[in-house]
Structures are given as C-alpha cells and as structure tokens.
C-alpha cells in the first residue's frame, strides 16, 4: 500500500513523499530542499529512500537532490532535456518506469520550462499525476521558457487523463489561483464553492491538494479556454478578438501574470 505525504518546503512548495508500507521504502518528487526529506527519514528510520523523481530543473525543485543522493544513494530520474543534478536516468516522452511497484509513464509538458515532464500512474480507481509546475490546482505555471501554444498544448494533453486522476502539483497556490478564476468567471458556481472551501481549509492550515481532473475542468480557467464566457472575458481584457483557444490561453496567462 502506498501513502502520499506533502512535505512543506520554502514558502509554498510541496515535496511529495510516496511511502510503501509493505516494503518500507519511499520516494520523493521534486525535493527542492533536502532538510524536510532527511527530517522525515530521521523520524521513520525503518524506511529507505529509493527514488527521486524530478519534473524540471528549477532550483526549488532540485536544490536538495545532490545531498539526498549522497546521503541515501537513491536513484534520480529526471527529464533528459534539462540539466538535473546527480541524474541516473534521463527520461523522455512516453518512457515508463517502476517506482515502489507503481508503473509511471512520462508526459512531456513543455511550457513552464522547455524540458518539463509530468509523471502519470494509470489506475482503474485512483490514477495519479505529479504535474510539477505545469498544471496547478485552479491554475498553471508561468511561462519562463516555453510559448503560450506549448503550454496550452501541454495542459490539453493532461486534461485528457481520466476525470478521477488525482493531481499532485508542487505549490500551494490554490487560493490565489481561485481568486483569479473567479475574476475570469464571476458567475461560475463551482469556482465560488471551491474558493469558499479552500479559504476555510487554509484558515485551518490545511493543504488544498491533491486536486482531481474533474474539478479542474470545472474550475481552472486555463482548462476552460473553449468556454464562451472565458473567451469573452479574455477578449475584454486583451481588447482584441482571440481567434483560437491558444490565443485565449495567452491572454489569460498575461492577465494572471499581473493579477
């Protein structure tokens, strides 16, 4: 049985730790800081860190890799197209690997960075997606390297995953993302309900993750670029007629950058 824990890091990062109760092994995703992981291992001395999964090269996702590799000799898996510290296995689109007995498939999702990947575990009841900084709860990552078209295509690819997919993104941005979503779709009842719920959770110091794909399709404006109300708001903000969904996305992303 696998349990998934969020290890907070920095101001708003989450390092995801997968704990295999049967083998007493564990894996982590995007350890930007080694300390939270080493602290967990110290509190759970029977467990051994076997794998480190990396979605992209930004330091808040890889800053702890070298120290963890030195301390644990864990296998480091990351995107082939980016420079990843201590990487053992370079991954490209559609690669498959087994971690803690779970098979994951790699999805290339350029946009936030050009080599960004996501890890997807297909399961009949509970599919898992570790999306890094591509798909957030109610939002998406900034475009540091890629184009709006690339990010729109990447999000569209992820949106085709099953509605039941649990989404483990790397930051606690949900509240600010939902405030933006409400500005885009003020009449969207699902967004209003989710905003109220997440506001309550955060006031209780609870995390807002994981999300799920069905919820994202109802409340994430960056997955709703085909909705008439979203296009109209994007047109209004950009003072132009956005003639494609990727153009709507570009308008929304530019607005969010200044929101």
UniProtKB/Swiss-Prot annotation:
Checking InterPro entries in the record gives: Clx_II_MBL (IPR035680), Glyoxalase_II_hydrolase (IPR050110), HAGH_C (IPR032282), Hydroxyacylglutathione_Hdrlase (IPR017782), Metallo-B-lactamas (IPR001279), RibonucZ/Hydroxyglut_hydro (IPR036866)
UniProt EC number: 3.1.2.6
Give residues annotated as binding Zn(2+) 1: 56, 58, 112, 133
- Catalysed reaction(s)? an S-(2-hydroxyacyl)glutathione + H2O = a 2-hydroxy carboxylate + glutathione + H(+)
Span list, region Disordered = 220-243
GO annotation (BP), single? methylglyoxal catabolic process to D-lactate via S-lactoyl-glutathione
Source domain of life is Bacteria
Biased-composition ranges, Basic and acidic residues, are 229-239
Pathways involved = Secondary metabolite metabolism; methylglyoxal degradation; (R)-lactate from methylglyoxal: step 2/2
Q: Which coenzymes or cofactors are required?
A: Zn(2+)
Enzyme class, UniProt record, top EC level: hydrolase
Q: Which UniProt keywords apply?
A: Hydrolase, Metal-binding, Zinc
**Entry cofactor note text?**
Binds 2 Zn(2+) ions per subunit.
Q: What does this protein do?
A: Thiolesterase that catalyzes the hydrolysis of S-D-lactoyl-glutathione to form glutathione and D-lactic acid.
Entry similarity comment: Belongs to the metallo-beta-lactamase superfamily. Glyoxalase II family.
User: Subunit structure of this entry?
Assistant: Monomer.
What name does the UniProt record give this protein?
Answer: Hydroxyacylglutathione hydrolase
Q: Which organism is it from?
A: Pseudomonas syringae pv. syringae (strain B728a)
| Source taxonomy | Bacteria, Pseudomonadati, Pseudomonadota, Gammaproteobacteria, Pseudomonadales
